[in-house]
Amino acid sequence: MPNSNPVAAWKALKDGNARFVAGQPLHPSQGIERRASLTQAQRPTAVVFGCGDSRVAAEILFDQGLGDMFVVRTAGHVIDNAVLGSIEYAVTVLKVPLIVVLGHDSCGAVKATLSALDEGEVPSGFVRDIVERVTPSILLGRKAGLSRVDEFEAQHVNETVAQLQMRSTAIAQGLAAGTQAIVGTTYHLADGRVELRSHLGDIGEV
């Protein structure tokens, strides 16, 4: 998947996910020649910021290979300075045109946050920090009248998209220039489908 533009990059990922869902992956960019070609430099087309859940392996569900995607993962795709720095590196140094926020159903971080708010079950240690970072998304969702877990999961994805634009000047500049786009997506564990939830910038669809 060559370095491209947001529209072409998003199409490549959609096509790859369609192959994965159909059980017909091509497993591209995984041969000896591809591996050798990446020893000196990388030119990924997309940066995927996703949840650390072991069931949500970005390269597999988008049917991509070595050097195709720059992947950043945290539990609940929560943002901190290291995450922003990693994504900005991909955007400013590697010139990646597309940022994908990848959430999923049955998200433990969202469920833990709901339990903390509703039942006072606040986790200990650094897990508490994850819950605290997801909490604003849940509160915004409740203010909007959301009630189902899947609605809160989508809300958290959309809020993450908004936060990336608001907190990173580099990302905001790329969006303003039309050289970058951000998509918010959720992955369905049962059928493997990636669903578009929101986007900023031109990705070739409404």
Curated annotation (Swiss-Prot):
Belongs to the beta-class carbonic anhydrase family. Gene3D superfamilies: Carbonic anhydrase. There is a cross-link at K11 (Isoglutamyl lysine isopeptide (Lys-Gln) (interchain with Q-Cter in protein Pup)). The gene is cynT. This is Carbonic anhydrase. The lineage of its organism: Bacteria, Bacillati, Actinomycetota, Actinomycetes, Mycobacteriales. Binds 1 zinc ion per subunit. Signal peptide: none annotated. Keywords: Isopeptide bond, Lyase, Metal-binding, Ubl conjugation, Zinc. It comes from Mycolicibacterium smegmatis (strain ATCC 700084 / mc(2)155) (Mycobacterium smegmatis). GO terms for molecular function: carbonate dehydratase activity; zinc ion binding. Its cofactor is Zn(2+).
